[in-house]
C-alpha cells in the first residue's frame, strides 16, 4: 500500500503517505492496492481509446465507464474490494475490445499497429489473492524517480481524479462531450507512460485544469437545465417531526428520484453535507417534504448519522466507516460509492430506503428552526453584480474573500472559522464546498442590503465564483489578479486539487491553501508554485489578513 492523495495522510520524517495495513481514511491495504491496479487497467483502456480514435472509433459506453470507475478511487468513495475488482475486470474487457478494434482498423488500412505494453497487456488473475499479488506492478511510488517527478505525476493523477468525478456528475445530468472524453483519455494514457519530463508533467497539470473548467461548465449547464438556477433561499437546519430520509453526497438526480418516490408517504427528506445547495434550486421547491438540511460536513457523519432517526443515502463521496455509529443497517450507497456489508441501491428504485425510513421512529418533535441563506450561484451573483459594483465604487465594499473548499477534522481548520470572523466589516465573503460549515451558521449581516456571506454552492460551483470574478474584471477594466479579491481554499481530497489546478490554469494568483500543503508535493515543487503563481500555505489569521489587505 502507498496512498498519499488526501490531506489527512500520514506524514513522518522518514516520508509521507499511508503505507501500512490501513490508511488514515480507513481504507485497507488490499483496497488501496486494488484501486491502484484498477487505475493501471483504466490507463490501458485510455491508451487504446486514444489509438482507436485515430480511426474514428469512439465508444460512448467506454467514455462513460473510465471516469466513473476512476471516481471510485477518490478518497472516501468506495471501500468494497469486490466491486473494485469488478470494475477492473470490466476495464480489461473494454481495453481488449478497443485493442481488437484498433488492430482491425490498422489491418484494414495496411498499417502496423503500435501496441501498448504494461497497462495494455496485463491479464488480471481470477482470484482476489492472485490479483493482490499482481498489484505491485501498479504501485504509484514505484520506479525510483525523484520526489519532484513523483510529485508532479501525482498532482496530475489526483487532479484528473477530481475531473473524472465532475465528469460523472455531469453525465448523470445528460451532459457529455466527445472532445472532453478524448482529452481525458489522452491525459490518462500519458500518465500511464510514467513520464520523467518535469516540464511536460507541469504542462499536463495545467491542461487538466483547463479541461476541468470545461467540465464544470458542463455540470453547471446540467444542473441549471435540470433544476433551474439557484435562488437566494432560507433553509432550516434543525430537525422536523416525522419519518425521515437523509441524502448526502453530491448527486441531485438521486435527490430528485427520492423526492418523487417519497411524495405523499409521510416522510421528510433532509439534505446533508454537499447536498445543502439543492434546496436553492427551483425544481426542488415544489416538494414540501424537502424540509431542510441536517448536520454539517462529512467528517461529522459518524455522530450525525448515528443520531439521525431515519434512513441515509450516500449518493457520492464522502462515506466513512458506518459500523462505528452502528447505523450500517440503515445507510445505503449509490453509483460508485461502496462499503462492505452496506446495501447498494442499483437502478432508480428507492423502495428499500423508503421502507426502512417508515420502519424507523423518525423525529419525535420539531426543533426551534435555525435559518441560513444559500443560493448565490452564477445567476444570483450576476443579478447582484450592479449593486455590488455600486457599493464598491462608493467605498462601502472594499474587499472580497472566497473562503471555502473541503472541511475536515483537524483542529487547524478552525483557522477558516477565525478568518471568516476576522475579515473587515466592509468585506464580502463568498463560500462553497463543505468548508462553508466552518462558519455558515454565523450571522455576518449585510452591506447596504448585500449579504456579507454569499453561499455559492457545491465545490464544483467554483465555476460560479469564477464567472463573477471574470464579470467584475470586465466591469472594472482590470486584470483578474488586480481585483480586491483574496482566495483562501481549504483542501482535503482530489476535487479540491483539480479546482486549484483550474484556478491556476486560468492565471489566478496569490491563492492561499490549508491547513497543510499536499504531502505529495515536495518542498521544491511548492517553492516553484509560489514563484510562478504566488500559491502559499495559510499561516495565522492576523498575518494572512494583513498580507491579503496589503497592510504593512
Curated annotation (Swiss-Prot):
Keywords: 2Fe-2S, Cytoplasm, Iron, Iron-sulfur, Metal-binding, Oxidoreductase. It holds the Pfam family Prismane. Disulfide bonds: none annotated. SUPFAM superfamilies: Prismane protein-like (SSF56821). CDD domains: HCP. GO terms for molecular function: 2 iron, 2 sulfur cluster binding; hydroxylamine reductase activity; metal ion binding; peroxidase activity. It is found in: Cytoplasm. Its main location: cytoplasm. [2Fe-2S] cluster binds at residues 3, 6, 18, 25. InterPro entries: HCP/CODH, Hydroxylam_reduct, Prismane-like_a/b-sand, Prismane-like_sf, Prismane_a-bundle. One of its GO terms (cellular component) is cytoplasm. It is an enzyme of class 1 (oxidoreductase). Its EC number is 1.7.99.1. Hybrid [4Fe-2O-2S] cluster binds at residues 250, 274, 318, 406, 434, 459, 493, 495. It catalyses: A + NH4(+) + H2O = hydroxylamine + AH2 + H(+). NCBIfam families: hybrid_clust, PRK05290.1. This is Hydroxylamine reductase.
Amino acid at each position: 500500500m502507498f496512498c498519499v492523495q488526501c490531506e489527512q495522510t500520514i506524514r513522518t520524517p522518514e516520508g509521507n503517505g499511508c503505507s501500512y495495513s490501513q490508511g488514515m481514511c480507513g481504507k485497507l491495504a488490499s483496497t488501496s492496492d486494488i484501486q491502484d491496479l484498477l487505475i493501471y487497467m483504466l490507463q490501458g483502456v485510455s491508451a487504446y481509446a486514444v489509438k482507436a480514435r485515430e480511426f474514428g472509433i469512439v465508444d460512448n459506453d467506454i467514455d462513460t465507464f473510465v471516469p466513473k470507475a476512476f471516481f471510485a478511487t477518490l478518497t472516501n468513495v468506495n471501500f468494497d474490494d469486490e466491486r473494485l475488482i469488478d470494475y477492473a475486470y470490466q476495464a480489461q474487457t473494454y481495453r481488449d475490445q478497443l485493442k481488437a478494434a484498433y488492430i482491425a482498423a490498422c489491418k484494414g488500412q495496411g498499417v502496423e499497429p503500435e501496441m501498448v505494453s504494461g497497462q495494455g497487456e496485463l491479464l488480471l488473475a481470477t482470484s482476489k489473492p492472485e490479483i493482490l499479488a499482481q498489484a505491485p506492478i501498479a504501485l504509484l511510488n514505484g520506479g525510483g524517480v525523484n520526489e519532484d517527478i513523483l510529485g508532479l505525476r501525482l498532482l496530475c493523477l489526483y487532479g484528473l481524479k477530481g475531473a473524472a468525478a465532475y465528469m460523472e456528475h455531469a453525465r448523470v445530468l445528460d451532459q457529455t462531450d466527445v472532445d472532453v472524453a478524448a482529452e481525458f483519455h489522452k491525459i490518462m494514457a500519458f500518465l500511464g507512460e510514467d513520464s520523467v519530463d518535469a516540464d511536460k508533467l507541469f504542462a499536463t497539470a495545467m491542461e487538466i485544469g483547463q479541461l476541468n473548467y470545461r467540465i464544470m461548465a458542463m455540470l453547471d449547464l446540467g444542473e441549471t437545465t435540470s433544476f433551474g438556477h439557484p435562488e437566494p433561499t432560507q433553509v432550516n437546519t434543525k430537525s422536523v417531526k416525522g419519518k425521515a430520509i437523509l441524502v448526502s453526497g453530491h448527486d441531485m438526480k438521486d435527490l430528485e428520484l427520492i423526492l418523487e418516490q417519497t411524495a405523499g408517504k409521510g416522510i421528510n427528506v433532509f439534505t446533508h453535507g454537499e447536498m445543502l445547495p439543492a434546496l436553492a434550486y427551483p425544481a426542488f421547491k415544489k416538494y414540501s417534504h424537502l424540509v431542510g438540511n441536517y448536520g454539517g460536513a462529512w467528517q461529522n457523519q459518524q455522530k450525525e448519522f448515528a443520531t439521525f432517526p431515519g434512513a441515509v443515502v450516500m449518493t457520492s463521496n464522502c462515506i466513512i466507516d458506518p459500523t462505528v455509529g452502528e447505523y450500517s443497517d440503515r445507510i445505503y450507497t449509490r453509483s460508485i460509492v461502496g462499503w462492505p456489508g452496506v446495501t447498494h441501491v442499483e437502478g432508480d428504485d428507492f423502495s428499500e430506503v423508503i421502507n426502512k425510513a417508515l420502519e424507523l421512529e423518525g423525529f419525535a418533535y420539531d426543533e426551534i428552526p435555525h435559518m441560513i441563506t444559500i443560493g448565490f450561484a452564477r445567476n444570483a451573483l450576476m443579478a447582484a453584480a450592479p449593486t455590488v459594483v455600486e457599493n464598491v465604487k462608493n467605498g462601502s465594499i472594499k474587499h472580497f474573500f472566497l473562503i471555502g473548499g473541503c472541511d475536515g477534522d483537524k483542529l487547524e481548520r478552525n483557522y477558516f472559522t477565525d478568518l471568516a470572523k476576522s475579515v473587515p466589516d466592509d468585506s464580502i465573503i463568498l463560500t462553497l464546498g463543505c468548508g462553508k460549515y466552518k462558519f455558515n451558521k454565523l450571522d455576518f449581516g449585510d452591506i447596504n442590503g448585500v449579504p456579507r456571506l454569499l453561499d455559492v454552492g457545491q465545490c464544483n460551483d467554483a465555476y460560479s465564483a469564477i464567472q463573477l470574478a471574470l464579470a467584475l474584471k470586465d466591469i472594472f477594466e482590470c486584470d483578474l489578479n488586480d481585483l480586491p479579491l483574496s482566495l483562501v481554499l481549504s483542501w482535503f481530497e482530489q476535487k479540491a486539487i483539480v479546482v486549484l489546478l483550474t484556478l491556476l490554469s486560468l492565471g489566478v494568483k496569490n491563492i492561499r491553501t490549508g491547513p497543510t500543503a499536499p504531502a505529495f508535493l515536495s518542498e521544491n515543487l511548492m517553492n516553484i508554485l509560489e514563484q510562478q503563481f504566488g500559491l502559499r500555505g495559510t499561516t495565522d489569521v492576523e498575518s494572512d489578513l494583513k498580507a491579503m489587505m496589503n497592510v504593512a
